[in-house]
């Protein structure tokens, strides 16, 4: 998390030195601009669309503005991931805003037919269906 006590520059350097890709997550209350100084060294940014800690929370629409701003600032090379409240209604909104990777925990694992849940999310994204 960007909000941790670790020095972001040192952490990113250590991750790259280990031959891995570097990513950082940003909590809902943190302005997305705080990640901008590190964009040239990051491979991915995870935009949290709920407060981290437990599943089943409602998607926070303010995350969409963060995704859009991040995509505009970083261009197409940075991967943007979204985690929290992602389902068939919110996933297309995230993709439209510029997200590349979606984490849909409760929307998949909270359903009796996980395959159907994944298919519904994919279909919604492909068809551009959305709504909060």
Question: How does the language model describe each region?
Answer:
Residues 2-4, 46-56, 97-117:
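Glycine-rich phosphate-binding active-site loops on the catalytic face of alpha/beta enzymes
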Residues 6-9, 32, 88, 111-115:
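Loop/helix-junction capping segments adjacent to catalytic residues or to phosphate/diphosphate-binding pockets
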Residues 45, 70, 83, 94, ...:
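Conserved, mostly hydrophobic/aromatic
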Residues 64-67, 91, 118:
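Short amphipathic alpha-helical surface patches that serve as generic macromolecular interface elements
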